[in-house]
Amino acid sequence: MESLIEARGLRLRYGSKTVLDGLDFHVPKGRVVGLLGHNGAGKTTLMKVLVGLLQAEGELKVLGLEPRRQRVQLLESLAYIPDVAVLPRWATPAQLITLMSGLQPRFSAERARKLLQRTSVSLNDKIKTLSKGMVAQLHLALVAAIDARLLVLDEPTLGLDVLSRKAFYEMLIDEWCDGERSVLISTHQVEEIESLLSDVLMLNEGKLVLAIPLTDIDNRFSALGHDAAAADAVAAAHPLLRYRVQGGSAALFEGQPPPELAALGQRLRPSLVDLFLALTRQPEINRSQGL
């Protein structure tokens, strides 16, 4: 399968601090990939490397191009919304559509207007009068109207309420994902986007601790729900993570639980949140409370 991103040994340092530490991964076409990590894990830095804003050591091809050296050519087929994306407050959506038509040869003004019809944003509204959720939907409509092959989103729903986040992701899936184009989304709101993803990349302190299609999670990891009587036996098996669930406790293992534990509990499907907590070395939590 064709890869839209190929990275080998990506490394970036700021002075004595290693921000990206030898990352190896690829993103095939037609995928929705979650780039997950806590604040400071290196997500934004990696995205800036992918779009050519920063130079890293190692080998990197995005859409077959070298991002730093061929950035102008790359941005013809790549759309990017950074975490600090700002639209001019004085402008209207109609003015931004006109501006984009002159700047981006692959931009379709007709498609942008069509996408905005599914939102509550009017073409003649001033940006300064729009809510955060409306601005996010406008921004997505503008980039989704570009005939690009790869969409890179850095914390696109940060600061939005639940309804606005839901509307944003529904629009993303409906209007962008077509089996050929790919999306890379960075977030620490793991539970919220799990159902949207086909693949996941997990960063922890600049290291890639997991790169996996979601369909492979059940083959590599397992969870065991158990009661208090089995707690000591489960702990002795050194699970990746122990956590509380409604009605008892659970433990996450790489591979299958030891055979001697099978009769002590119930097999559970590990969630992406559980893996995230286990692989980014977070302490025990009550899963009912979320992250």
Task: Go through the PLM ranges and name each one.
Residues I5, L20-G22, L75:
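Conserved structural motif at the start of ABC-family nucleotide-binding domains
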Residues G58-R69, Q73-L74:
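Conserved ABC transporter NBD signature motif
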Residues P82-H139:
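ABC-family P-loop ATPase nucleotide-binding domains
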Residues A167-F253:
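ABC transporter nucleotide-binding domain
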